[in-house]
Structures are given as C-alpha cells and as structure tokens.
C-alpha cells in the first residue's frame, strides 16, 4: 500500500489492479474536512459502459462516519478503513455502485462526484447546503 502524508492530508492507494487492458485504482484520502474514497477506471470496459476511456468517482463522508463504514464493509469496527476497503473491492466484480448501495442501506450519508470525458456530475450529501 502506498501512502503519502502531507500536512493534514494522508493518501493511501488501497488497490491497483489490471485485468486485460483495463485498470482500476481505489484510493483513500484523509483530509481535515473528512474522508474521500476515489475509484478510477480506464480501458475498454470503461469505454463500453460509460462512453469514456476513463472515469474517476469520489465519495466524501465525515470522519465521524468511519466506524459505521468499516462495520458495513467488514462486519466489525476493529479493522482499519484502508484494509476494509481493499478487502471489499478485491471481491470479484465489486464496483463503486456496490459501495454506494451498501452505504445507502446502512444509512451512511455521503456526497458523490464523478468526472469523465463528458464532464462532472455531483450529488451533495442529503441535507447539505451548497455554497
């Protein structure tokens, strides 16, 4: 696992894998404002599914929700978040949409953003006020 600590920023590459000509990268980032999970893909499957050669999605949640996310991912809170995310996405065919469904089912609020060649789409956390 690669990590970088820069002031109030910590970034962990929790999963990087290639399958054929496709690549998938999952990154966990801790900031003063909370936790971010980035999910990036590129390759033929991404192009076929989304009409873009690459796609990067990001889920943002408050640090106070970390224990709830670890429990939803791993079934207990003793695992670290990076390990729980790595284990979750190491399962065959697990996509970011599966994580969003899991968080919705567990009642864990989050904000979502996605960027690809077509532009950027954002969904703020329910109840958040856009500035």
What is the role of each PLM region?
Residues 1-8, 66-70, 101:
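A contiguous, well-structured "functional interface" segment within a domain
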Residues 13-36:
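Amphipathic, interaction-prone secondary-structure segments
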Residues 35-84:
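Acidic, aromatic-enriched beta-alpha/helix-loop junctions
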Residues 7-8, 30, 52:
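A generic structural signal for short, non-catalytic loop/turn and secondary-structure boundary residues
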Residues 89-131:
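C-terminal charged interaction modules
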Residues 2-21, 42-47, 119-120:
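Eukaryotic intrinsically disordered, low-complexity regions enriched in proline/serine/threonine/glycine
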Residues 28, 77, 81, 94-95:
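Alpha-helix capping and helix-coil boundary motifs
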């Amino acid at each position: 696992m690669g990590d970088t600590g820069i002031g109030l920023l910590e970034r962990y590459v929790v999963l990087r894998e290639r399958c054929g000509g496709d690549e998938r990268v999952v990154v966990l980032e801790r900031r003063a404002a909370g936790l971010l999970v980035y999910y990036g893909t590129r390759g033929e499957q991404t192009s076929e599914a989304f009409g873009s050669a690459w796609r990067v999605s990001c889920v943002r949640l408050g640090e106070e929700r970390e224990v709830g996310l670890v429990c939803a991912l791993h079934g207990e809170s003793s695992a670290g978040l990076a390990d729980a995310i790595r284990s979750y996405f190491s399962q065959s065919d697990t996509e970011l949409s599966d994580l969003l469904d899991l968080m919705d089912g567990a009642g864990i609020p989050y904000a979502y953003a996605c960027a690809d060649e077509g532009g950027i789409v954002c969904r703020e956390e329910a109840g958040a006020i856009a500035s």
